[in-house]
């Protein structure tokens, strides 16, 4: 049994979302033992910039019935039983990194909204992240009322009432609110049980053509590696349907940029999968859930520094279409989210430039046409997406991009 457990892949992605400094990364560490801020700049500034992934095994103690992520029950010392493996996506809570958070949100099967008990609720990014979950239609939400060790009972209850008021009428209206201390590991068992109860593993059809959204891409070769020892580029992301196998031929869309008559165009590319990594293990097959590393025969120059982020991977000829322009059915929010003062969302104007998040891709769109609740946008970078997919729409307000609504891709 032990060996089988080792190669288990995470079967759901759970987003850690919320305002900067409310304890998302600390909570991820309490659940997984992994500190997801590994970027040097992140450690220096103490905030998450890139999206971090960390896996945990949800386990139940057959003796006392409590849940944990540990092989030995922290409450009674009995050996625990494996329930399932989950992957936590630690998304940035800083306002300037909202578009990164939206890319991560497209991979989430559920979310834990972390709200600090020692600050008034909602803070700007708390509201913004909840809106992002609303926009992508994510209803599997748990609220972790964190830093409970810093407040007395009265303050905790007042904060609880503020949270209840804040979530009324939103996708999180019926979300459980669980008081915890991520720092001291208090009430983590209750949170883990809530994950079991409220964030189910989605039913997936393994026979659908594979589709993976690329979030990161790397050149893993150290400087000075001799040419014969160089390995191909690596794509990091999450499979949203189907499965990938070592040896598969894959297509990547929209692909790589090239110049033609002074204009940048994109060309899909095909390559072969030479290795697959999931949950820190090399595997022969990878499925939806968790971060998957796909080793390819691509020139690592194409994949260095996240250059391939936003692409979609699948079987040649089986991927969604690539769009240079989109027709969107638009749903605007009443007010701009993320700003300290409340601003009304003005209607979209012709020739306005918007920032669009489509899956893990982000692109600028120039508004070329307006209709009733519809817009047409010409894209700076093409995207690979299905009709019916949701697109998050942000507008530049001051020096920041602010979420103002979403669009649904029309044929």
UniProtKB/Swiss-Prot annotation:
This chain's protein is named: Translation initiation factor 2 subunit gamma
Q: Where is this region: G1?
A: 18-25
Name any one GO molecular function: translation elongation factor activity
Q: Where is this region: G4?
A: 146-149
- The protein's gene is named eif2g
Which positions bind Zn(2+)?
A: 61, 64, 73, 76
Give the E.C. number(s): 3.6.5.3
User: What is this organism's lineage?
Assistant: Archaea, Methanobacteriati, Methanobacteriota, Thermococci, Thermococcales
Does the record bear Hydrolase in its keywords?
Answer: yes
Q: Which residues bind Mg(2+) 2?
A: 21, 46
Report the domain of life of the source organism.
Archaea
Q: Which GO terms describe its cellular component?
A: cytosol
Q: What range(s) does the tr-type G domain occupy?
A: 9-203
G3: region residues: 90-93
* This protein's UniProt keywords: GTP-binding, Hydrolase, Initiation factor, Magnesium, Metal-binding, Nucleotide-binding, Protein biosynthesis, Zinc
